[in-house]
Amino acid sequence: MKRVRAHLRIYGRVQGVGFRWSMSREARKLGVHGWVRNLPDGTVEAVIEGDPERVEALIGWAHQGPPLARVTRVEVKWEEPEGLEGFKVVG
């Protein structure tokens, strides 16, 4: 099975709105692996790996986020997969 890795930076009102926990739940539903964390500048960073279609689906979800979020921009950098397993909320 082909596996891809995306490094995301999510901008807007994305902290204090349940973004990380909602993304973790969505990732688990999709079978996507990786992690998500808040950064001091108010953005959210995530690294996600898995089947290309499932990773794209989670990127699509990140453009909306949970109901209280107001996402203004999502930056995506494609990287080489490293074999992450599970999905964690860190930081």
Swiss-Prot record:
Q: Where is the active site?
A: R20, N38
What Pfam families is this protein classified in? Acylphosphatase
Check the UniProt entry and state the signal peptide residues, or none: none
Entry annotated with the keyword Hydrolase: yes
SUPFAM superfamilies xrefs: Acylphosphatase/BLUF domain-like (SSF54975)
Where in the numbering of this chain does the Acylphosphatase-like domain appear?
Answer: 5-91
NCBIfam families reported for this sequence: PRK14436.1
Family annotation (PROSITE patterns): ACYLPHOSPHATASE_1, ACYLPHOSPHATASE_2, ACYLPHOSPHATASE_3
Q: What is its EC number?
A: 3.6.1.7
Q: Which gene encodes it?
A: acyP
Q: Describe the reaction catalysed, as an equation.
A: an acyl phosphate + H2O = a carboxylate + phosphate + H(+)
Q: Which organism is it from?
A: Thermococcus kodakarensis (strain ATCC BAA-918 / JCM 12380 / KOD1)
Would you tell me the protein name for this molecule?
Acylphosphatase
Q: Which family does it belong to?
A: Belongs to the acylphosphatase family.
Molecular function GO labels: acylphosphatase activity
Q: Which UniProt keywords apply?
A: Hydrolase
